From Swiss-Prot:
Reaction it catalyzes: UDP-N-acetyl-alpha-D-muramoyl-L-alanyl-gamma-D-glutamyl-meso-2,6-diaminopimeloyl-D-alanyl-D-alanine + di-trans,octa-cis-undecaprenyl phosphate = di-trans,octa-cis-undecaprenyl diphospho-N-acetyl-alpha-D-muramoyl-L-alanyl-D-glutamyl-meso-2,6-diaminopimeloyl-D-alanyl-D-alanine + UMP
Keyword RNA-binding: no
Top enzyme class: transferase
Gene name in the database record: mraY
Keyword match Lipoprotein: no
Entry protein name: Phospho-N-acetylmuramoyl-pentapeptide-transferase
UniProt superkingdom: Bacteria
Compartments in which it is found: Cell membrane
Transmembrane feature ranges: 2-22, 51-71, 80-100, 118-138, 167-187, 196-216, 234-254, 256-276, 277-297, 340-360
Pathway terms, separated by semicolons: Cell wall biogenesis; peptidoglycan biosynthesis
Organism: Bifidobacterium adolescentis (strain ATCC 15703 / DSM 20083 / NCTC 11814 / E194a)
Length: 365
């Protein structure tokens, strides 16, 4: 518990202290956000707002976990787990890809950075590296960092092992690529209003911190009664999820309306990569659809808008993603953000109830 508190406190201090320093640096370098011309006209005043805020979020999560790991090493002789390193790799690698995208935007002085093809290739390479390492690297607990299958909670309802190990690895790589691409793009789409992505991500990662801690408390081989989980190093996952939630909380102090800084793709892609990796590491890939329900709604609204327009040349929403639809209906930006936070809270609550209900059912209580 002390290691968890240390991680949380370090992450909070890094974001609270580091974000204003980054704002000054970005101002000095003149790295401001460029606003899409087809967006709501009310957003044009945000042009020039410092971006690259995701750098602080990434740094806060890493330093928070490293501080926690150092404490455990000095007091108990515990070495860092590969599971934690892999989850952080997913976050940092996607964050680095987002940083390249953000840097391209400010260099070209426009709202578009990397090409769709370039971003896809980058995500494919990084997700594939993560997938292969997750299956082959050893862990302290003896449980694999990932399962070659699809899970709602814990045990796969569909295993990729049906046709041998090679096929299982190939299918798992495809599955991980889908998850990484889906969640990075989902949180990226959500990052369209001041504080929306940061606040929603904070709520989602609080949910994952609770899930991972419950899996740690009921880890297979423990003395606690009830169903136990064969999850690799869930305490590390708890700490990382908690650090991510706190990092978003600290960043939100400066990102709330009117935002003093944007997280940019450096932040949204990193948070998406971390969310995907947490779902894989905790064996809750399909539960994540509910846990990150707001991100799913944002993504589906964009898909529906594009698909319907291509078929009929008409629009379902005034603008997509759906948060812009409510803006154009006359809702103040702050009202949209707070209500969307409330929706995400409900999704997380539903996911936690389902997770606990599954544990009760499997425990026979």
């Amino acid at each position: 518990m002390i290691s968890l508190i240390i991680g949380i406190m370090v992450s909070l201090v890094v974001t609270i202290v580091g974000t204003p320093l980054l704002i000054k640096l970005v101002h000095k370098l003149n790295y401001g956000q460029y606003i899409r011309q087809d967006g709501p006209k009310s957003h044009l005043v945000k042009r020039g707002t410092p971006t690259l805020g995701g750098v602080v979020i990434n740094l806060a999560v890493v330093l928070g976990w490293c501080s926690s790991a150092l404490y455990r090493f000095l007091t108990r002789g515990e070495v860092p787990s590969w599971s934690a390193v892999l989850v952080l790799f997913a976050m940092l690698s996607m964050g680095f890809l987002g940083f390249i995208d953000d840097f391209a935007k400010v260099r070209k002085k426009q709202s578009e950075g990397l090409t769709v093809k370039g971003k896809f290739i980058g995500q494919f390479i990084l997700a594939t590296i993560y997938a292969v390492l997750a299956l082959i690297l050893p862990t302290k607990s003896g449980f694999p960092s990932a399962q070659a299958g699809m899970s709602f909670i814990e045990k796969p309802f569909f295993s990729f092992e049906f046709a041998g190990r090679v096929v299982a690895i190939v299918l798992f790589v495809i599955w991980v690529n889908f998850l990484m691409t889906a969640w990075t793009n989902a949180i990226n789409l959500t990052d369209g209003l001041d504080g929306l992505a940061a606040g929603s991500s904070m709520i989602a990662f609080i949910g994952y911190a609770i899930i991972a801690f419950w899996e740690f408390y009921h880890l297979k081989g423990s003395d606690h009664p009830g169903f136990t989980y064969a999850v690799s190093d869930p305490l590390d996952l708890t700490i990382i999820a908690a650090c991510a939630a706190v990092a978003c909380f600290g960043f939100l102090w400066y990102n709330s309306n009117p935002a003093s800084i944007f997280m940019g793709d450096t932040g949204s892609l990193a948070l998406g990569g971390l969310f995907a990796a947490m779902s894989i590491a905790t064996h809750t890939e399909f539960l994540a659809i509910i846990l990150g329900g707001l991100f799913v709604i944002e993504t589906m609204s964009d898909i529906i808008q594009v698909g319907y327009f291509k078929m009929t040349h008409k629009r379902v929403f005034k603008m997509a993603p759906i948060h812009h639809h409510f803006e154009l209906k006359g809702w103040p930006e702050v009202k949209v953000v707070v209500r969307f936070w409330m929706i995400e809270m409900l999704f997380v609550l539903i996911a936690l109830v389902l997770f606990y209900g599954d544990w009760v059912a499997r425990s026979g209580l």
